[in-house]
Amino acid sequence: MACVLEPPLRMSVLSEVTASSRHYVDRLFDPDPQKVLQGVIDMKNAVIGNNKQKANLIVLGAVPRLLYLLQQETSSTELKTECAVVLGSLSMGTENNVKSLLDCNIIPALLQGLLSSDLQFIEACLRCLRTVFTSPVTPVELLYTDASVIPHLMLLLSRSIYAQEYICQIYAHCCKGPDHQTILFNHGVVQNIAHLLTSVSYKVRMQALKCFSVLAFDNPQVSMTLANVLVDGELLPQIFAKMLQRDKPIEMQLTAAKCLTYMCRAGSIRTDDNCIVLKTLPCLVRMCSKERLLEVRVEGAETLAYLIEPDVELQRIASITDHLISMLADYFKYPSSVSAITDIKRHQETGQPCIDPEEAEPRGTRDESQCTALSISHPVSQIQHDCLLTSEELDHDLKHAHELRQAAFKLYASLGANDEDIRKKIIEAEHMMDRIVNGLSETSVKVRLAAVRCLHSLSRSVQQLRTSFQDHAVWKPLMKVLQNAPDDILVVASSTLCNLLLEFSPSKEPILESGAVELLCSLTLSENPALRVNGIWALMNMAFQADQKIKSDILRGLSTEQLFQLLSDSDVNVLMKTLGLLRNLLSTRPHIDQIMSTHGKQIMQAVTFILEGEHNIEVKEQTLCILANIADGTTAKDLIMTNDDILQKIKYYVGHSNLKLQLAAMFCIANLTWNEEEGSQERQDKLREIGIVDILHKLSQSTDPNLCDKAKTALQQYFA
């Protein structure tokens, strides 16, 4: 059985391992069952808190033997239980240890152990399963491979408090998406764990609460069920709301707030409900304060960002709660550079006393998993002034620097999503634009993405585009981001660029000069529909009221082939933006005539293709507007008048039942019949021949005043 550590140990190390640890493994093979039991107990005592010993025993083959003893019918229940305990201890070591246990098929063996009638053995198996499943190297799908496992775990919930804690923890960690939510929901997880929220055990209450938070996330079905579940006469949202009280543990407040947030976003609680406005939102703002642990501040900010993201009223309330906008500035005060870390460590090594973390809490209160993982984080100011942290704890704090920046950017993005006044407050925060610009070049991809999202949110402000964005030349780092970034960053960055290319943005000119046309044209070739949309959208904004050179550059950059590929795109958003681009390209007479002289045949083919296709009203309206622009050209209108197929389509749509299409077709007719232009008489006669005038007479009696006026204006051209 392939049950070894990676990479393999050197021979010199292996001989040392053999000398010091072989006797523990040898005793597992003793013919006397009592000696085997004592050997397992001694092994248990040897590995607790000793990762080196754990690794040694795994290398020497202890795991297959322990699993064999655990599964043997002839093994006593006590021996099986002790084997499960040792395996659990081994799984609390390094990730390589867990990988080795998985290679030895530990999970099926432990799941089989759950069929036992002995409670202590069941609890030992569950404890080990909990540790294995919560390791980042364990595929959570292993919980769902055997369809009988979930219902059996549901039955075990009634066996003991420990069983409840471990099972809820397994569920919470292994529920990673809608498929898992559905499986757990269909097996009655909501009804089976709801009563655990009132358990006498704090750990059980917390694990049940965490389970509900992952079940409710982005799941309307589960959330609606939760909203109507009663426990001891109280609805679950009321129980969650009580857990938000300030006297409850921070972990409980935060997790309960997540439950209510997810239920609100899933639609089972209204955004104006008091439990959201007066309890959940203020609680999450409290979690962002600098008195909280770094992990709490990160989760609090990200959860609050998610809660308020779609609702402008919640954004306004959050922005004036506890000085949140200025509070978030502290999120950027944590060092993330090597030099800053070195400076702090050098300060720490100047002889000032540091407290051992194990001395900071009473003995006997932590299990092994707690002893081997630091769980306390302090503000940097405390590191610098009090020097209460060990180097290991300091590293633990510093790794959160990126997470803090990411969370702050996310929350700023949500706060500024809709309200101009809030955006102004955010941008006026000290060094805010500098922080965003710096965030665009962070080494962490997640921080860069969050910074771009924040920039995108703020770029919706006309005022800020004209002032702060120009003052800080935001377009420069944004263009750099667009040169080489993962798709998720490219999507948001290109959306931001669309806003910077609006006609009133001072950034438009320098962006054009920096070679943006080529970049945006390349985005339209992407397999990602969102990137194609944004690329063509930015080009559309670029072409609005642009000079002939820019329009020519766009057409040259896209190529005729690519332009018509976009016009036949399966994504309607891509099609709409491409039509918008064409409409902007064909916007003044000289430009219309110039473009139609070189691309007229292909454009007319595309227009015909779209008007004949199964497209929605908006697509056809936009296409008719392009025809109206072509009809406004001096020479370009001849391409319509010599195309009987197009003329019949204009006739069809001016008599259509949809008002938008009628009006768009009417613009075509008005431009073709305008009698002040050369050749108007011939065009009027041809339109009369195909029956357009008869339709105009009917439309002049329309109940819609706009359509009626347009029809009368067109008729007047015939009698002027």
Curated annotation (Swiss-Prot):
It is found in: Nucleus; Cytoplasm. InterPro entries: ARM-like (IPR011989), ARM-type_fold (IPR016024), Armadillo (IPR000225), ARMC8/Vid28 (IPR038739). Pfam families: Arm. One of its GO terms (biological process) is midbrain development. GO terms for cellular component: cytoplasm; GID complex; nucleus; ubiquitin ligase complex. Keywords: Cytoplasm, Nucleus, Repeat. ARM repeats lie at residues 51-92, 95-134, 138-176, 178-217, 224-265, 269-309, 313-352, 421-460, 463-502, 505-544, 548-587, 590-632, 635-674, 681-720. The keyword Repeat applies. It comes from the Eukaryota. The keyword Nucleus applies. Component of the CTLH E3 ubiquitin-protein ligase complex that mediates ubiquitination and subsequent proteasomal degradation of target proteins. Identified in the CTLH complex that contains at least MAEA, RMND5A (or alternatively its paralog RMND5B), GID8, WDR26, and RANBP9 and/or RANBP10; ARMC8 has an ancillary role in the complex. This is Armadillo repeat-containing protein 8.
